[in-house]
């Protein structure tokens, strides 16, 4: 986003100064400071010609992308307000629930800002541009940032990738075949084949018709061990009661 701004050279100089002055800070703190000071300015000064040049370089260099759309649109979409998220929240350790609730209750008191809306749209548009340029995409969530729960957040990421313009099959590949290819593990992961890892999710409905069908899990095969729906529900119940 910073390289796609009309004032990218100015932002780069400022960023170098921020990095120099914050050399003793933790990486996460420094990254957040840069985002806070530069992200909105960069988006307000978005330059399509510059963006296309950046994307051309990424495509030429075969630089794969992980949009983390669920995370980068969370300030607008507020996933923690949904029923599905609230269900997944109950499986987290109690101390994590308590810590998150303090932040969430404060967030609920704030309104979605015009910039939240604009940045969310920018992320969807840019992900589509990345896809249209033929740049490989992988699915990632950066859980637990912004209260994204493990497991559920990946299903959500597949859905928003489709919303951004990928087909359901392309979204599924972004979470399976593409990462295996990126890490040169095609002969072990990412596809159903003899001698590959026996890690599978069996669904009750076709995700190519509706990507949200990835959540309709009938059974899981993990390292060759079969868990039907009853066994999966039992594991979830145990998780709730043993934290």
List each language-model region with its residue ranges.
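Short aromatic-centered micro-motifs
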Residues: 220
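Glycine/Thr-rich phosphate-binding loops of Rossmann-like dinucleotide-binding domains
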Residues: 74-75, 211, 230
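Acidic, glycine-enriched loop/beta-strand segments at the rims
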Residues: 149, 167-172, 181-217
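Extracellular/periplasmic ectodomains of large secreted or surface enzymes and adhesion receptors
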Residues: 225-243
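Solvent-exposed coil/turn segments that connect beta secondary-structure elements
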Residues: 70, 205-207, 225, 232
């Amino acid at each position: 986003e910073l390289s796609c701004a009309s004032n990218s050279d100015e932002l780069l100089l400022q960023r170098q100064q921020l990095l120099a002055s914050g050399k003793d800070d933790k990486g996460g703190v420094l990254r957040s400071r840069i985002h806070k000071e530069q992200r909105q300015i960069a988006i307000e000064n978005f330059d399509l010609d510059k963006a296309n040049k950046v994307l051309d370089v990424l495509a030429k260099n075969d630089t794969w992308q992980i949009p983390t759309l669920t995370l980068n649109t969370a300030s607008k979409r507020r996933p923690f307000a949904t029923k599905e998220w609230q269900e997944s929240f109950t499986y987290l350790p109690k101390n994590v629930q308590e810590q998150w609730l303090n932040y969430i209750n404060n967030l609920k008191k704030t309104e979605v800002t015009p910039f939240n809306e604009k940045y969310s749209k920018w992320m969807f548009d840019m992900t589509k541009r990345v896809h249209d340029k033929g740049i490989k995409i992988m699915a990632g969530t950066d859980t637990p940032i912004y209260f994204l729960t493990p497991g559920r957040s990946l299903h959500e990421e597949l859905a928003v990738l489709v919303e951004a313009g990928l087909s359901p099959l392309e979204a599924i590949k972004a979470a399976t075949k593409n990462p295996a290819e990126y890490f040169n593990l095609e002969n072990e992961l990412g596809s159903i084949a003899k001698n590959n890892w026996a890690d599978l999710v069996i669904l009750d409905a076709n995700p190519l018709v509706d990507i949200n069908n990835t959540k309709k899990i009938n059974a899981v095969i993990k390292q060759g061990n079969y868990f039907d729906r009853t066994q999966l529900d039992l594991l979830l119940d145990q998780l709730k009661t043993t934290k």
